[in-house]
């Protein structure tokens, strides 16, 4: 009987340990999203691999699914030479199958006419595990300040 209890305890602990998320895993997935958004490497098929099918992004007062967001990105890429995001001040909340992160995003965009746009956002992302893989389900972006030079 004691051996059975020990076996069940160890099995339960191993299952709980292997199923949980870490802050590093969640932050890494968020950073991967922004790396895949870089205009130099952006491909819709690649970014969709880390998104749920019902992914939504709320930005600039609009709600977009990935198809709509892709259209926006394609149009923006016609006048944008480079994109860069600096994420910081992560606040992470986790459970076994989901993660929520709020963070600061400082973005720099260089346009074809030489303008440099500096944007400061407060953002939030919700991620869920699907078949053991962490994916982005929802992203909220609130522009705090924008400066054009």
Name these PLM-found stretches.
Residues 78-80, 107-118:
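Short, cysteine-centered beta-strand-loop-beta hairpins and adjacent loop/turn segments enriched
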Residues 92-100, 127-134:
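A short, structured loop/turn motif at beta-sheet edges
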Residues 120-149:
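Short beta-strand edge/turn micro-motifs at domain boundaries
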Residues 9, 14-50:
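Short, low-complexity N-terminal intrinsically disordered segments enriched in polar/charged residues
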């Amino acid at each position: 009987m004691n051996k059975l209890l020990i076996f069940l305890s160890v099995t339960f602990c191993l299952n709980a340990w292997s199923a949980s998320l870490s802050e590093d895993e969640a932050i890494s997935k968020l950073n991967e999203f922004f790396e895949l958004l870089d205009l130099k490497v952006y491909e819709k098929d690649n970014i969709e691999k880390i998104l749920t099918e019902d992914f939504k992004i709320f930005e600039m007062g609009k709600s977009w699914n990935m198809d709509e967001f892709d259209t926006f990105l394609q149009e923006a890429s016609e006048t944008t030479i480079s994109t860069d995001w600096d994420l910081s001040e992560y606040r992470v909340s986790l459970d076994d199958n989901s993660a929520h992160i709020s963070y600061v995003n400082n973005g720099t965009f260089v346009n074809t006419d030489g303008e440099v746009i500096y944007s400061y956002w407060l953002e939030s992302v919700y991620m869920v595990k699907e078949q053991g893989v962490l994916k982005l389900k929802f992203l909220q972006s609130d522009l705090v300040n924008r400066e054009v030079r």
